[in-house]
Amino acid sequence: MATPTQEAIDTFMTITGSSNAVAVRKLEEYRGNLNRAVNAYFTHGDQNSYDAMDIDDGVTPVLSEARTTDPFPLRDPNFGRSLFDNDPVMSRPPFVSHPREAREIPIEVKDSNGPSGQSNDAPTIEDVTETAQAHGPAAQEAVIIDEVSDDDNQSAPTGQSRHAVPVGSAENNMQHYNDIEEQIIRAAIEASKMETGDDVTKSVTVQSAEREVLRSEGWKASSSEREASEMVSIPVQQGSRASNGRFAAPSSLSEDDDDDDDDDPDYVEEEEEPLVSHRPRRAVSGSRSSLNDDLPRSPEAEDATIHSPGAGNGFPSEWGGISSEEHDEAIMLEAAMFGGISESEYGVPYAHYPQRTQRPPSPSLTAQRLIREQQDDEYLASLEADRVKAEARRLEEEAARVEAIEEAKRKEEEARRKVEEEQELERQLVSKEASLPQEPPAGEENAITLQVRLPDGTRHGRRFFKSDKLQSLFDFIDICRVVKPNTYRLVRPYPRRAFGDGECSSTLNDIGLTSKQEALFLELI
């Protein structure tokens, strides 16, 4: 048989928290295989010392145990000890969780090592409906524990998961804090199921539930010494059914309560039936009246709870187990979102919050606001004036641009027309020059010499027949290209006579130009 190494033994002891002898024996059984030895230890455990039981949750592993340690270590007197020391926390008796209706059924513990019966290590019965826990010998019910080993769940041993913490002890306080998360989840689930007649859902957030649980746990921690000496049990009518569909069963917190129940003539034991429990949950020692107030119950039970002396620490169940501050915040949030909320929806009159009166502003603040408004108005006016000026300047520039374009077009048209006129005049002059009659010779008796003085001072002369028309003289003056046609008239100085376009068809002899030589000048019209 292989001898395990000291490193493997130390590792096994660190992981499992067992003794050196157990570590050596397990490692020798599995030939030094540390993984198989640890798995076998957590799977089978020490069967000679503990009752095997199929438990879903199992013992919290090392890391989980360290994680769920008391969050307030300064209050824990066992904080300096190791997690694996043989302290009361690691040697507490097992407990069994069962529903409310199962609490009326006797529960027996069957163990292969001995006959069933109650002992100091008897399983602690926990009510999953959050009623008070029955500890150790105080539990009158018997539980049949089905010894089925869970081979699949090898991460945690089952033999070390059944321990009970005495009420009022330091370990009980640590257990309270370890169960905060479970209480928060339960409170949130129970609150989410509650609805009003108008389908208005009142839900409890995880943060609010945590605050309330911490508040209640703080009160419990401060009064733990008083609870250790004096236990208060609330009798519950047997056979009554709560609003959540479970039977409300009596629960005892001490031996005195059990004795009282035995002496009570009205107490009737239910038919004993064996109960096989496969789903134990972690025990929560101490009173759970704060959480019982959050559970839905019958109207009579709610009225009795609300008017009972011990109901001052709980919150109304119709509000989902939330505090009055959170209830008021929810009402204000709903009023802000939906513009108001009617009191008839919940049947509870809500306190009207006084609106804060608006005080008039101070004179200096009013003057500053007035000055600022005037400055803003002046600034806006200057911006408007600048905008108007810019718009006028833009319009002027646009008009000037359009006018320049039109002027250019007009000049271009005028130049084109002038060119056309010149071209037309040139064609006319060419035609007139072609139609001008032939000049007679110098010795012709019927010929007449005409001298015309132009406006520029030059003189032009030519011989014509006396039978030629006056139009021939106008054509001769036009082809000289000094003045434009139809812009002048001929004048004879003595006797003065002017000849115009109306006499162009008359001959020279008819208009009185009969001398051999005549002098004429042009007069512009």
UniProtKB/Swiss-Prot annotation:
CDD domains: UBA_Ubx1_like, UBX
Coiled coil start-end: 380-436
Domain UBX: 443-521
InterPro entries the UniProt entry points to: UBA-like_sf, Ubiquitin-like_domsf, UBX_dom, UBX_domain-protein
Modified residues (Phosphoserine): S362
Domain UBA-like: 2-44
Pfam families for the chain: UBA_4, UBX
Entry keyword annotation includes Phosphoprotein: yes
Residue ranges with Acidic residues bias: 254-274
Keywords annotated in UniProt: Coiled coil, Phosphoprotein, Ubl conjugation pathway
Protein name: Plant UBX domain-containing protein 13
